Structures are given as structure tokens and as C-alpha cells.
A protein has these predicted regions:
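Hydrophobic, aromatic-rich transmembrane alpha-helices
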Residues: 100, 266-308, 315-322
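Membrane-interface alpha helices of multi-pass inner-membrane proteins
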Residues: 119-120, 165-183, 188-195, 215-216, ...
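Membrane-lumen/periplasm interface segments of specific transmembrane helices
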Residues: 208-250, 323, 327, 334
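Hydrophobic/aromatic-rich transmembrane helices and adjacent perimembrane loops
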Residues: 132, 139-142, 187, 322-359
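Membrane-interface transmembrane helices that cradle and orient dolichyl/undecaprenyl
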Residues: 107-110, 149-170, 197-200, 277-293, ...
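Transmembrane-helix motifs of polytopic, lipid-linked glycan transferases
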Residues: 89-110, 125, 148
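Perimembrane helix-loop-helix junctions
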Residues: 158-159, 188-219, 286-300, 345, ...
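Short periplasmic/luminal acceptor-recognition loop of GT-C membrane glycosyltransferases, typified by
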Residues: 190, 274-276, 390, 394-444, ...
Length: 520
């Protein structure tokens, strides 16, 4: 008996998709090894390492919702000595996973093969995804969870779908989990919840209730740690982001970075680093055309009740994602994370017609190149020199640990660059868990709050270190001058180390300066 051609074709399609995913994962792993170090990585690497000894908020400061360090905590033991590169590798795989989940969501939503591929490649080539998957920040995990939640929620819209209640529960868990990993994903999660409530008669009470229960479970990590240390959690999740970036920019005469005109330009620029801007314009044009001629839809845009419901859901998610991207100041590319999945999914569903025109295909290809360009430029030099910044930092961290242990120095290591010290085997002073971010604040915390939140701002440095002299101080990565720190943020640490007779050693792989406590 000959086999049916359909299963054979289906298997071939899945094998092809798996091959593309493996290639993408390999490229993202390569990028993670050769991308330069971003100082934002410090607090996320430190938080995972400090999970060996405590919990976010209660035992060390953390400036986001807490799912990522909780979920990745086992790596602090499994990858000891290699934690920084391991966290980058995990993010690379999560980034590739987000692309796979978006492709699955597009296929489930009824996109053609080309439309689903377009949605996936648009996300994969966006600067936002490439940045999230190349560094050890907290952008890849919530993006993956959000794309997974979107894929899981789509069957709930189908009256004939199996296991709708289970799918709704898992969707709520994933979407709320994304918000528990990064607070800005709370807006799209809330948008899905609002959509479900507005369509409760169509979706049914069971799936809507399951979605809500899943959402509550996904939020449990945040609720739990908030209950353990409510003031510190509120500060880390809400207050810091509402106060500290504004204070820093104002003190340094950079108020224009916070203003709406420049914020709009920055948002458009980041959307243009990939297919975001093209997708937004295409969706806008399609909406205007559908309103002008609602009864003359082409075959590729078949108008069905399910398609209309999907469109309403995605448009609501796009709106929520745009608000989530707009609210933080200054705007950076990673803030597009809550916006891009729904945007590219909708783009894949409606782009079949526009893609028949050669100039549209050329524009999409150009947008994809624009998204890849910055990452390509950033890693090209390191690839040519065969220099991996993350491995160089790990080598220096290990050398620092050897030097500190050779002096039998007790105590912790102090640094504004925790990602460069975490693999030394020497405990990090938890007051520096956020790297430079709480250190550089002026009036964001009172002295009592800084003590309660396990932080040590610059103006309290002398008193704080005098009371607990560190085994070593690692500097050299925060030398950029600013108005309130003309010699760089590392300068107060260097000054304190010199006054107390610490011996300087230059680490060979990165040129960082390690100050060792004098023998007693």
C-alpha cells in the first residue's frame, strides 16, 4: 500500500522548518558568543548567581518582575564558573524558540506557508530579537512566553477546537508568566484578558475562567515575592523605573531624551530596524481599504467570523504593545518586545496580496537587512579577530578569583559590572547586585530605604565600604564621563581602593582593573 502524499508532504514541511530553526539557533548562539558586553546585563546575571544565597527583593535588589532569576536559578549551580556565557546561550535558544512559536501561531491562525514564514523571518531579523537573543538581559524569556501564550490562545477562538479549556489555561499561564518576567508584557496579557471577557458569550465561560486561573498562576512568582518584601518589590518593579531614568537624564542635561518628539523618532527608528515599520504601514493601509470597500475583499483576505475575531484580537494586542513600548523613557529597542509578535502575526496574515508586488518584496527584504545590519556590524570585528567578549570576561573573572584566593582574603567582590565578576568563585557583594543602576541614583531612595533594599548609592559609598571592606574591587568598565561623574562611575570605587591601600592588578583579557585588599 502506497503512503498518502499529504503526510509525506507534511513531514517534509516539518523537517524543513526544523532545519531552519536549528540554523537560526546556531546563528543566535554564535551572535551571543561574539556580541559586545552591554552593561544592562550585569543585574540579570547577578540576580541568577545570588539565587544561591537568597531571593530577589528580600535579600538583594532586583529592578524587574522576578520570574527570570527564579526560573534560571538552577544554572547558578549547574554552570558555576560559566554562568555568564550560559545565560547568553539560554537567551539565544529562547529567542529561536520565540520565532518558532510565532511561526506555529501564524500557521494556526490560517496564514499561508509564505505568510507564516514572513511572520517568523520578520521577527528573526528584527534588531529587537537579535539584541534580546545575543545578551544576558531579561528580554528573550518574556518574548518566548508571550509568543507561546499567543499560540495557545488562538485555538480558544475556534468553537470546534479540542481541549479549548486546557489551551486557555496554558495561555493564561504563559502570558502572565511573560509579565512575571518583564512588567511591560503585563499590558498585552491584560489585553488578552479584556478581549476574552468582551467575548465571553462566544468563547464560553469555561475557557475564559481557565484563562483567568492560568493568569493568576503565572503571576504567583511576583505575588509571592511581593508578599515577602512588599516595599522592596514595589520599588524594584514600579518605583525605580518611574523615577531613576528621569533623574539620571535630568542630572546629566539630557532632558530631550525623555521628550515626546525624540521618543517618537527613536521608536520609529527601532521599528525600522526590521520589518516593524513596514508591517505597521501595511496593516494600516489594509484597515483603510477594508473600511472603504468591505464587500470587495480579495481571495487571500477571506472574511470569516473567525478571521474577524483574530483580527480584533491582534489589533488590540498591537495597541497594547505600542503603549507598552511608548511608556518607558528613554525608548530602547528592547521595549518593542510586547509589540512585535502580534504585529508580525497580523502582517503574515494579510501580506499575501501585497507580497505579489515586486516593490513590496524589495521593501520587506530591505527592512530585514536593516534589522540584521547592526548586529552584523557589532559582531563582525570580534569574529574576524576570533575574540569572544563573554569568554574573555569569564577568563578574567576566573583569574580574579585565583588572585583573591591566593591572598586568603575574606569578604565579597565589589563592582559596577557584576557580569564580569560572577564567574570568579568569589561572592558578589549583594549591595551591587544591580551594577551601576542603583549606585548612580541621588534622591530615588532615602538612606533608610537603600539599606532596606540592599543598595549602596554613590553618596553612601565610603561609609558602606568602611563598614564591610571588600576582598577586592573590580573596575574599568564604567569609565565614560558624565555631568555628575566626570571621571566615570568607577572613579569613586578606584578612589576608595587607593585610599585604603588596595593593590591594582590589570586583568589581561579585558584590561579591567582588579584592586586587591592589602594583607593584614
Amino acid at each position: 500500500m502506497s503512503r498518502s502524499p499529504r503526510p509525506v508532504g507534511l513531514r517534509r514541511r516539518w523537517r524543513t522548518a526544523a532545519g531552519y530553526w536549528i540554523a537560526l539557533a546556531g546563528l543566535l548562539l554564535l551572535a551571543s558568543a561574539f556580541t559586545g558586553i552591554d552593561h544592562d546585563e550585569g543585574q540579570y546575571v547577578a540576580a541568577v548567581a545570588l539565587m544561591r544565597h537568597g531571593l530577589p527583593y528580600r535579600d538583594f535588589a532586583y529592578l524587574q518582575t522576578p520570574l527570570q532569576p527564579l526560573l534560571l536559578a538552577p544554572l547558578a549551580w549547574w554552570c558555576e564558573g560559566w554562568l555568564f556565557p550560559a545565560l547568553r546561550a539560554v537567551n539565544a535558544l529562547l529567542g529561536a524558540g520565540a520565532v518558532a512559536m510565532l511561526w506555529l501561531a501564524a500557521r494556526l491562525a490560517g496564514a499561508s506557508n509564505r505568510g507564516a514564514a514572513l511572520a517568523a523571518v520578520a521577527l528573526a531579523s528584527s534588531h529587537m530579537l537579535l539584541f534580546a537573543a545575543s545578551v544576558a538581559r531579561n528580554d528573550a524569556l518574556p518574548l518566548f512566553l508571550h509568543c507561546t501564550g499567543l499560540w495557545l490562545f488562538l485555538p480558544v477562538l475556534r468553537a470546534d477546537a479540542r481541549h479549548r479549556t486546557l489551551s486557555a489555561w496554558l495561555a493564561g499561564l504563559a502570558l502572565a508568566g511573560a509579565a512575571s518576567a518583564k512588567i511591560s508584557y503585563g499590558l498585552p496579557a491584560a489585553a488578552v484578558g479584556a478581549f476574552a471577557l468582551l467575548h465571553v458569550r462566544t468563547l464560553g465561560r469555561g475557557p475564559v475562567l481557565a484563562l483567568a486561573i492560568g493568569g493568576l498562576l503565572g503571576g504567583l512568582p511576583t505575588f509571592w515575592l511581593w508578599a515577602l518584601a512588599p516595599e522592596a518589590a514595589r520599588f524594584g518593579i514600579l518605583d525605580y523605573s518611574l523615577k531613576a531614568p528621569f533623574e539620571w537624564r535630568m542630572l546629566n542635561g539630557q532632558a530631550t531624551m525623555l521628550a515626546a518628539p525624540l521618543s517618537l523618532l527613536r521608536m520609529l527608528r527601532f521599528l525600522a530596524q526590521g520589518c516593524g515599520l513596514v508591517a505597521l504601514v501595511t496593516i494600516g493601509v489594509a484597515l483603510m481599504q477594508s473600511r472603504r470597500a468591505p464587500r470587495t475583499q480579495p481571495a487571500w483576505a477571506a472574511d470569516t467570523p473567525l478571521r474577524r475575531m483574530q483580527s480584533r484580537l491582534l489589533l488590540l494586542l498591537i495597541l497594547a504593545g505600542m503603549i507598552a513600548a511608548w511608556l518607558p523613557r528613554p525608548i530602547y529597542v528592547q521595549y518593542l518586545g510586547p509589540l512585535l509578535p502580534a504585529l508580525f502575526l497580523h502582517f503574515g496574515l494579510i501580506a499575501e496580496g501585497p507580497l505579489q508586488q515586486r516593490w513590496v518584496r524589495a521593501l520587506v527584504a530591505l527592512a530585514m537587512l536593516a534589522g540584521i545590519a547592526q548586529t552584523g556590524i557589532d559582531i563582525a570585528g570580534n569574529l574576524i579577530r576570533r575574540h569572544s567578549p563573554v569568554l574573555a570576561a569569564t577568563r578574567d573573572a576566573r583569574m580574579a578569583g585565583q588572585l583573591i584566593r591566593a591572598r586568603h582574603a575574606e569578604g565579597a567582590i565589589v563592582t559596577l559590572s557584576p557580569e564580569r565578576a560572577i564567574d570568579s568563585g568569589i561572592p558578589l557583594d549583594p549591595r551591587f547586585a544591580t551594577g551601576l543602576f542603583l549606585f548612580r541614583t541621588r534622591s530615588v531612595m532615602t538612606p533608610d530605604q537603600s539599606q532596606a533594599f540592599h543598595a549602596l548609592p554613590m553618596d553612601q559609598l565610603g561609609r558602606g565600604l568602611d563598614g564591610a571592606p571588600p576582598a577586592a574591587i573590580l573596575t574599568g568598565m564604567e569609565r565614560a564621563p558624565s555631568r555628575i561623574a566626570p571621571d566615570g562611575l568607577d572613579a569613586p570605587l578606584v578612589s576608595w581602593a587607593r585610599r585604603h591601600g588596595y593593590r591594582r592588578v590589570i586583568l589581561p583579557a579585558t584590561g579591567a582593573a582588579l584592586y586587591l585588599r592589602p594583607r593584614t
